[in-house]
Swiss-Prot record:
Converts seryl-tRNA(Sec) to selenocysteinyl-tRNA(Sec) required for selenoprotein biosynthesis. The lineage of its organism: Bacteria, Pseudomonadati, Pseudomonadota, Gammaproteobacteria, Enterobacterales. Its main location: cytoplasm. Its cofactor is pyridoxal 5'-phosphate. It holds the Pfam family SelA. Pathway: Aminoacyl-tRNA biosynthesis; selenocysteinyl-tRNA(Sec) biosynthesis; selenocysteinyl-tRNA(Sec) from L-seryl-tRNA(Sec) (bacterial route): step 1/1. It is found in: Cytoplasm. This is L-seryl-tRNA(Sec) selenium transferase. The gene is selA. Homodecamer; pentamer of dimers. Binds only one seryl-tRNA(Sec) per dimer. It catalyses: L-seryl-tRNA(Sec) + selenophosphate + H(+) = L-selenocysteinyl-tRNA(Sec) + phosphate. Its EC number is 2.9.1.1.
């Protein structure tokens, strides 16, 4: 080791000395001595590596207190950061899907702060069942005989299959063997549930006779899967829920449908495209229906199974149910969300997801007009800033081919600055509250459909 590195190593202050510095004492009080000491040790190690590689101290060695404060702040920052979702996707899987209603937020806060009757009966002071209160509410809203709640819809499908058809055959149309995000595939779920898949029909056309011909003594379930994240047009045919239910009754084989997203209300009344409703399939005679809580329903992540009482009771008894059950926070948020559906005339105002989906294009246009002048003044030297019509998508596999007319602010790089859009997007992602748009067609788009606070967005972008 040369003389210079030796001198540099000797300039590294001892941990005890650093902890006694007046500028670091407040950090110890704020973050605790254990965390501060561990961070200082890591900083010392970083400095030693810098000396070894570059024969120089890091720049921050001139002010250990300031560098320590920055590292502690970064370390304590929450991993789940609030963001401005201006991506154009309303129910964005990567951004947490549905936003909670205020009543759901209050309900979660309450059950976090106090013991609650999660599995306790006040009537007889005995153990209760965590699903019963919500099951009654779901039955009231949908006409189902009974209901089961688990932690997501994938769990609902897995539990249903494991209960009804483990070791047996499940008949599904070839055109409905869906894959959703994260490589979640219906055939793979069947394998995990111990079922044997029997594909019938073709990719674009499946008839009732295809199901009928596949039935044998090993058939345990006739199943439909709603193709919520893609659509097949043209020369197509599919078996309706009523047809499948009729065949199931005649063959004494249960029937099920996985709706994926699903909606508890008729979306057409709000000017939105139609989405299958679980109560419709129950009315058609389908035995079991599964759907998500955090998509069009507008609630927390949850999987909901509705259907015939004897099948729901069997599902509740399955050992997997305990592994997949929902916790008290999920149940509280889901109950509060479902209670909003008891007052459908107020739903559009109280359910954030529905409110965002039903915003008129004129509302976003008006927002763009208010925001545009200040953004043009701030970014005009480097970017051409305009307001333009665009289309939002619902997201999370809901109504995949339908788009919602919206309005956006767009940023186009001036000539010769092609990489500046990526730099700008990266800069916005690094803000205290990141701003997330999308780059398309040589422009950075900020779709305003999900913008709730114009003032906060301007404060973020004009720094």
């Amino acid at each position: 080791m040369t003389h210079k590195p030796c001198l540099l190593y000797s300039q590294l202050p001892a941990i005890d000395r650093l902890l006694r510095e007046p500028q670091i004492t407040p950090l110890v009080e704020q973050y605790g001595q254990t965390l501060v000491t561990a961070t200082l040790r890591r900083m010392q190690e970083q400095a030693r590596i810098n000396i070894k590689q570059y024969q120089a101290l890091p720049d921050w060695c001139d002010n250990w207190a300031s560098a320590l404060g920055q590292q502690l702040e970064q370390k304590q920052a929450l991993a789940l950061k609030p963001v401005f979702n201006l991506s154009g996707t309303v129910i964005h899987t990567n951004l947490g899907r549905a936003l909670m209603a205020e009543s759901a937020i209050e309900a979660v806060t309450q059950v976090m702060r106090s013991p609650v009757t999660l599995e306790y009966s006040l009537n007889n002071a005995e153990r209760g069942h965590r699903d019963h209160a919500l099951a009654d509410l779901l039955c009231e809203l949908t006409g189902a005989e009974d209901a089961c709640i688990v932690n997501n819809n994938a769990a609902a499908v897995l539990l249903l299959l494991a209960t009804v058809a483990s070791g047996k055959q499940v008949v599904v149309s070839r055109g409905e063997l869906v894959e959703i995000g994260g490589a979640f595939r219906i055939p793979d779920v069947m394998v995990q549930a111990g079922c044997r898949l029997v594909e019938v029909g073709t990719t674009n056309r499946t008839h009732l006779k295809d199901y009928r011909q596949a039935i044998n003594e090993e058939t345990a379930l006739l199943m439909k899967v709603h193709t919520s994240n893609y659509n097949i047009d043209g020369f197509t045919a599919e078996v309706s829920g009523r047809e499948l239910a009729t065949l199931g009754i005649a063959s004494q084989i249960p029937t099920a449908i996985d709706l994926g997203s699903g909606s508890m209300i008729n979306m057409v009344q709000y000017g939105l495209p139609a989405e299958p409703m679980p109560q419709d399939y129950l009315n058609q005679g389908i035995d079991l229906v599964t759907f998500s809580g955090d998509k069009l329903l507008g609630g927390p992540q949850a999987g909901i199974i509705l259907g015939k009482k004897h099948w729901i009771e069997a599902i509740q008894r399955h050992p997997l149910k305990r592994a997949l059950r929902a916790d008290k926070m999920t149940l509280a948020a889901l109950e509060a969300t479902l209670r909003l559906y008891q007052r459908p005339e107020q739903l559009c105002q109280q359910l954030p997801t529905l409110r965002l989906l039903t915003r008129s294009q004129q509302q976003m246009h008006d927002m763009a007009q208010r925001l545009l002048p200040q953004l043009q003044a701030h970014y005009g030297d480097q970017f051409i800033v305009r307001d333009e019509p665009c289309y939002s998508q619902i997201g999370s596999g809901s109504l995949p081919v339908d788009r919602l007319p919206s309005w956006a602010l767009t940023f186009a790089a001036v000539e010769g600055q092609g990489s500046s859009l990526e730099r700008l997007a990266r800069c916005w992602r690094g803000l205290a509250k990141p701003v997330l748009g999308r780059i398309s067609g040589g422009r950075l788009w900020l779709d305003l459909r999900c913008l709730e606070d114009e003032k906060a967005l301007l404060q973020a972008l004009l720094l």
